[in-house]
Amino acid sequence: MQQNTSLYDSLNVTAAASTSEIKKAYRNAALKYHPDKNNHTEESKRKFQEICQAYEILKDNRLRALYDQYGTTDEVLIQEQQAQAQRQQAGPFSSSSNFDTEAMSFPDLSPGDLFAQFFNSSATPSSNGSKSSFNFSFNNSSTPSFSFVNGSGVNNLYSSSAKYNSNDEDHHLDRGPDIKHNLKCTLKELYMGKTAKLGLNRTRICSVCDGHGGLKKCTCKTCKGQGIQTQTRRMGPLVQSWSQTCADCGGAGVFVKNKDICQQCQGLGFIKERKILQVTVQPGSCHNQLIVLTGEGDEVISTKGGGHEKVIPGDVVITILRLKDPNFQVINYSNLICKKCKIDFMTSLCGGVVYIEGHPSGKLIKLDIIPGEILKPGCFKTVEDMGMPKFINGVRSGFGHLYVKFDVTYPERLEPENAKKIQNILANDKYIKAERSTMETADSDCYCDLEKSYDSVEEHVLSSFEAPNLNNEVIEDDDLGDLINERDSRKRNNRRFDESNINNNNETKRNKYSSPVSGFYDHDINGY
């Protein structure tokens, strides 16, 4: 016969669960499905009774053993199963039953009484309902309250749908919300690391009165410390009885006299404080990385009803936001791109020295361009180990790479004599010859054949490219407009360029950085 596990399923435990696990599961389920916390819906009442019945059987070792063996604790059903088993073993003429009905005695407790007894609260069984410090009544004759009160009738001043006792170790507390904050950091701060101070406004339990609102509490005489009042009314031959929250103590069962009110929190049980937190940003931290300060959130939160509720403190979650850097961009967490490295035409052809300022390390980066290595406009070169600090599985592992994008600035024109010299030099270069030999249009004979294929050829000399008057004209070709804008931009940039200093450009840069600096890196660059 397959084992019946419906009682275990009600508590959401397995059949092999220990007594402590069953007790813990019952506590959580009873608090979750208690009718007072679910607006006394029919589903919550049914579920609560089912949970209590399951716990009443499974907490008792003898009843649990019977349930595990027979799948029920009903005396009649068990006797039938025993008789059937004996008939199968001894034959059809044997019939006897040694079932002990003593194990089937149940305490006369309602679900509300069982719930109150489990949480060490006073409970008084009643034919109309269960009256306890939880004030759960099945007759639902009045709007019930739900307050946790310990055996001595003491609770704190936090009240919403429930009043929590700060001294009840078995009481379940919800986790409070996290406090979120954004921390803006520059690229240099992420490279070097930093320590920031964060001012946080939060609500904490009063350390003087431990959340009770006073050092001395008095028992409410109206409800005699129960937190509830029972009233009766005679209607002819019938007597109606109902329970409601005590109006004098608010259901707490106790109150604090004015002379005993805690001066630190003024009887509230909590205080608002401003905490200065030290936030450490590790070197190599990334954009949108989280820093979690565990348990630094609010210990008391406000409820929708205007009250306050004690909670498990949430965390302070800080999100790192990297500010935009004008010169560098981070890719793949640890690599850097230098977006604006301008070099002149001569350096791109003949080599030289290029300096990069503003590196997040605070160092001046010196790049030696090898003569003969032509730098094309927009090309990338790699400087190893000059990126951001790199981490692998949380362990620091060197640095990323620095990728430099070169922007070549061309002169407006060259002197004809120098242009002729450059042409003669380039014509005899073996690399130029090899490249020209691979181009179909490099040979002049090809141009001759091209000219012969046309009836007429007009020959012109380029002049200054002047932008047309666009006041009364519409240009439909977007490429022409882009070409004009690019030409004007280059013309303005080259107008500021002093042609007399072209030959002394490298010497000027060396003189510029001759003063002492905090650090100086000299690197060769590699192809990207």
UniProtKB/Swiss-Prot annotation:
A zinc finger (CR-type) spans 193-274. Residues 485-499 have a biased composition (Basic and acidic residues). Present with 125 molecules/cell in log phase SD medium. Its main location: cytoplasm. It holds the Pfam family DnaJ. Gene3D superfamilies: DnaJ domain, Heat shock protein DnaJ, cysteine-rich domain, Urease metallochaperone UreE, N-terminal domain. Residues 485-528 are annotated as: Disordered. Residues 4-73 form the J domain. It is found in: Cytoplasm; Nucleus. It comes from Saccharomyces cerevisiae (strain ATCC 204508 / S288c) (Baker's yeast). GO terms for biological process: protein refolding; protein sumoylation; protein unfolding. It comes from the Eukaryota. CXXCXGXG motif repeats lie at residues 206-213, 218-225, 246-253, 262-269. Putative chaperone involved in protein folding. Interferes with propagation of [PSI+] prion when overproduced. The gene is APJ1. SUPFAM superfamilies: Chaperone J-domain (SSF46565), DnaJ/Hsp40 cysteine-rich domain (SSF57938), HSP40/DnaJ peptide-binding domain (SSF49493). This is J domain-containing protein APJ1. Signal peptide: none annotated.
